[in-house]
Amino acid sequence: MHKLLEQLVDEMVNRGVHYEDAQREFDKRFVTQVINKCGGNLCKAADTLGVHRNTLSRKIKDLKIKNLA
């Protein structure tokens, strides 16, 4: 996994992707994946992510995540 992540970061740096854009895209994909794996159950997803459900709800809103499982 470290090798894949290193390759991805190298590619993003070479393409001039800004840190904030990379962080936002990672967060959006990571959170969406966890929610989908939890069958759309936000309480379970929040527990899996190690955050409070309210924090997850705020993150979903901030990241404009839609079409959850």
Where do the model's predicted regions map?
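Bacterial C-terminal helix-turn-helix
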Residues: H2-A69
